[in-house]
Every structure is written in structure tokens, then in C-alpha cells.
């Protein structure tokens, strides 16, 4: 059965309101697309990431008359009578299959692969992490996650203790354990992140080596040989003294979640405690690494 697709150009402030109205008008699905090629931070679990320029895409059944819907939208003050939109007919597809077909095993560095559960691992002898994409968060597809995974792959983590600060889905924690770490401590402010990390560790048979804490519950004397923090520039600056305290002398640090233009300022700030390396970049994003003084 074909469908009618309505595309509306708007902004992040109004996208959710338009989405709700279109659902009331009978839309069977709503998705958001980037109106321009702009970077977006990884969202927290449960959040919907939106760009400043957002396209709301609604699907309606083929026999739907959209004339009343368009007239209603014209009355909205933030859209107006001549709002930008497009209506077209599209053929039916197996949308679940198409979504699954978009995800393939991805290699990071020399040893590490992140594989959806429905795909066969390309190299059974490699270090394989099984992780299914859900939210656009912590699946390896975001440049900041990729930068951190590549860094972990480059290290000898044998018998090392690791802290994953802002563990999210647990992808970095699980990868570190699969790469040989003796123990990983994951810390996150979100209960959903703690649950997701636990579930992904169980799926990869490393749950007994992973300890998970909310920030207020982390042990006061916690220290590690390696610490990775894939969060954002603001929290990285605010948490710098605590992060430094958590890394043993001579220990390794990786920071990501940074746009290129933010990297130098954060690197300079962390140089109080770490000998900082040159930044690594992927697309618009950066990763900083250093060694504890």
C-alpha cells in the first residue's frame, strides 16, 4: 500500500508541537530530519535530538485528504500561510527490514568490531561487541564514540582498571572489558544509562567485571589506570578536578564530546594535571588524550 508523505520545514522549538498536531490529524508515523548539515551532540538516553533547522516528516494512509491538515497548519503563527512543505506519494516498504539493513558491523582500530545482533560477525577471532542500535546514542556511529573506541583499541588494557565517565549505553565500558581490562567502573547521571550499560554487559558476558554507579554513589577512593569521558565540554571542565583525582599517576585519559573549536581550551585546562597530546579529529569532533602527571 502506498503512503502520503508530508514534509514540513521548521525549527527545533516548534517541531514537537507540529508532530503532536499531525498525530492528532491521523499521521501513522513521525520522524525528524536535519534541515541542514549541522553537527549534533549525542543526546541523553530518552531524549529526542533535534537540529536548529528541522524537517518534520509525517506518513499518512494513501486515501487521506491532507487539505484540512494544511489549512490548519497555516493558522499556526509560527508557520504562517506560506509555510514551507512538500507532499508526495511513496511506495510501501518493509520499514523494519530497511532500518535493520542500514546497520552493519563496524571496525574500530585493528581489533575491535561493534556488531548488531542480527548480523554475522565478520571475524570471529576479533574482539566483537554485540550492541543493537536503539536511540542515536552510544552505538559507535557517532564520531565521538568512534574516536573513543579507536583509542581504547590502541591501548594494552590487559589487567588494567578503567573508568567510563558518562557511560551511556555502556559501549565503551563493554569494549574495554572485551579488550582485556580487568575491571571497569561506569558512572552516569541517568538511571536509564545504568540499566542500558548493565544489559549490554550481560549480553556480552562481562557483567561480573562491570560496576555501575550514579555520581553520588561512586566510591570516594575510586582510581583507575585508564579513564575515558565522552560527555560535553561544559561538564568536562566542571568535573576536571574530580576526573584528575580518579586517574593514577602515569594513567591514561581520553576526553571526547568536544567540537573542534572547544578542544584547545579544554586541553589547556587539563594540562594542570595531565601531559596532553595533540588532539585527534573526526568530522566536526575532537578527542583529547593525556597522561597523568
UniProtKB/Swiss-Prot annotation:
Disulfide-bond pairs as recorded: none
Reactions the enzyme catalyzes: L-lysyl-[protein] + 3 S-adenosyl-L-methionine = N(6),N(6),N(6)-trimethyl-L-lysyl-[protein] + 3 S-adenosyl-L-homocysteine + 3 H(+)
GO cellular component, one term: cytosol
Record localization: Cytoplasm
Group of enzyme by EC: transferase
E.C. numbers: 2.1.1.-
Pfam families assigned: PrmA (PF06325)
CDD domains: AdoMet_MTases
A biological-process GO annotation: methylation
A molecular function (GO) term: protein-lysine N-methyltransferase activity
Keyword Protein biosynthesis among record annotations: no
InterPro entries xref list: Ribosomal_L11_MeTrfase_PrmA, Ribosomal_PrmA_MeTrfase, SAM-dependent_MTases_sf
Family the UniProt entry places it in: Belongs to the methyltransferase superfamily. PrmA family.
PANTHER family reported for this sequence: ELECTRON TRANSFER FLAVOPROTEIN BETA SUBUNIT LYSINE METHYLTRANSFERASE (PTHR43648:SF1)
Function: Methylates ribosomal protein L11.
Protein name: Ribosomal protein L11 methyltransferase
Gene coding for it: prmA
Amino acid at each position: 500500500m502506498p503512503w502520503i508523505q508530508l514534509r514540513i520545514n521548521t525549527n527545533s522549538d516548534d517541531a514537537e508541537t507540529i508532530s503532536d498536531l499531525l498525530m492528532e490529524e491521523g499521521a501513522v508515523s513521525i520522524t525528524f530530519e536535519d534541515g541542514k548539515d549541522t553537527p549534533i551532540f549525542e543526546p541523553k538516553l530518552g531524549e529526542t535530538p533535534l537540529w536548529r533547522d528541522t524537517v518534520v516528516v509525517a506518513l499518512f494512509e494513501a486515501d487521506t485528504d491532507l487539505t484540512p491538515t494544511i489549512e490548519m497548519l497555516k493558522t499556526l503563527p509560527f508557520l504562517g500561510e506560506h509555510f514551507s512543505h512538500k507532499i508526495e506519494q511513496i511506495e510501501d516498504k518493509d520499514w523494519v527490514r530497511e532500518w535493520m539493513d542500514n546497520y552493519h558491523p563496524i571496525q574500530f582500530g585493528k581489533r575491535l568490531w561493534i556488531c548488531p545482533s542480527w548480523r554475522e560477525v565478520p571475524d570471529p577471532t576479533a574482539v566483537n561487541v554485540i550492541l543493537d542500535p536503539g536511540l542515536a546514542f552510544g552505538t559507535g556511529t557517532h564520531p565521538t564514540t568512534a574516536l573513543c573506541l579507536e583509542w581504547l583499541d590502541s591501548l594494552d588494557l590487559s589487567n588494567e582498571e578503567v573508568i567510563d565517565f558518562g557511560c551511556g549505553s555502556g559501549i565503551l565500558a563493554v569494549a574495554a572489558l572485551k579488550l582485556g581490562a580487568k575491571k571497569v567502573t561506569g558512572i552516569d547521571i541517568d538511571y536509564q544509562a545504568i540499566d542500558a550499560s548493565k544489559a549490554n554487559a550481560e549480553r556480552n558476558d562481562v557483567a561480573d567485571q562491570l560496576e555501575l554507579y550514579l555520581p553520588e554513589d561512586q566510591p570516594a577512593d575510586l582510581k583507575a589506570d585508564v579513564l575515558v569521558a565522552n560527555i560535553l565540554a561544559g561538564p568536562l571542565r566542571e568535573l576536571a578536578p574530580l576526573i584528575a583525582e580518579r586517574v593514577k599517576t602515569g594513567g591514561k585519559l581520553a576526553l571526547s564530546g568536544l567540537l573542534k573549536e572547544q578542544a584547545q581550551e579544554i586541553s589547556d585546562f587539563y594540562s594542570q594535571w595531565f601531559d596532553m597530546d595533540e588532539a585527534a579529529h573526526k568530522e566536526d569532533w575532537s578527542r583529547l588524550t593525556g597522561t597523568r602527571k
